[in-house]
Amino acid sequence: MLQNLCRALAFGSALFAATASFAEDRPDQIVIRYAPVTEPQLQPIAEYVKKAHALEKAQILLKPLRLPRPLKIEMRGCQGEINSWYEDDVVTICYEFLDDIWKNAPRETTPAGVAPIDAVIGPYVDVVFHEVGHAIFDYLAIPLFGREEDAADEISVYLTLKFPKADAHRLILGNAYQYRSDLVGHKLPLSLEKFANEHELGAQRFFNVLCLAYGYDPKLFGDVLKKGYLPAERADDCEDEYKQLNYAFDKLIRPHIDQQLAKQIYEAAWLPPTTMRPPRRLGRHSRPASAK
C-alpha cells in the first residue's frame, strides 16, 4: 500500500514538473541583432542583408517555436572566418558566410532549375534553421542518436518543407546547390580532416537533402530523380527516411510549436520572383571549411 502511494506521488511529481516546464515555454522568443561592422570589405554584405530584413524574416519564421528563454540570432564579422554556430543561447552567422553564399550563386538559372536568387535564399534559410536546430536540442533537452550535426541538417530540411510547395521546392534546390558547390570546390583526393569533420561531406549532405525532400513528396520533387540528381537506389528508401524524421519531430519537437501561429506564418508565400537577381560579389573571401 505504502509502495503504491509512493509510486503515485512520484508519478504526480514528474507530471507536475513536465506540465510546469511546458507552461513556462512560450512563442516569440527570438531576439535579433546586426552587429556593427568594422571590416570595410564586409560593409556591402552587412548593409544588403540589413536592408533586406534578413533577420527580421527569420524572427517571424521562428516565432511559433515555444522556448523557455530568449534565443538571440546575431550577424557579425568573424575576422575572415566563413562560419556559423550556436553557443550559450546565441546563434552567430558570420557576414563572411553570407558573402560566400552570394559569391557562389550562379549567374543564370541552372539546368536543375535553380534560380540565382534561390541559390542565395535557400542556403540562408538552411543555416538559420540548422543553427536554431542546435539551439532546440539544447533548450529542450532533445535526446539524440547519432551526430548532432546530422540531426540539425534534418531539422533544417524538415522545417523548409513546411513552406508552401512552390517555395519549398525552390528553397530545397537552392540549398542543395550550395552543398553541390562545396563538392565542386574541393580538391581531390580529400584530406583526412574532411572525413574526420563533425559534418558530413558536401556531397553527402547534397544527397541527404534531396532524399528527405523526395521522401516527403515524390511528385513535387520527382524532377531530382528524373534528372539523375538523386540515384534511384537511394530514392527507394527516402520515404522511410522521411517517415522516421517526421515521427521523431512529432514526438519530440512538435509539442513545443504553436501550431496555430505556425499555420498562419508558413502558409504565406515568402520568396521573391525567380527573376530577381542577387547582387554580384559583395565582398572578397575564399572558400572555407563547412559551417558548424
What are the roles of these predicted feature ranges?
Residues 25-46, 136-138:
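Acidic/histidine-rich, surface-exposed loop or edge segments in extracytoplasmic proteins
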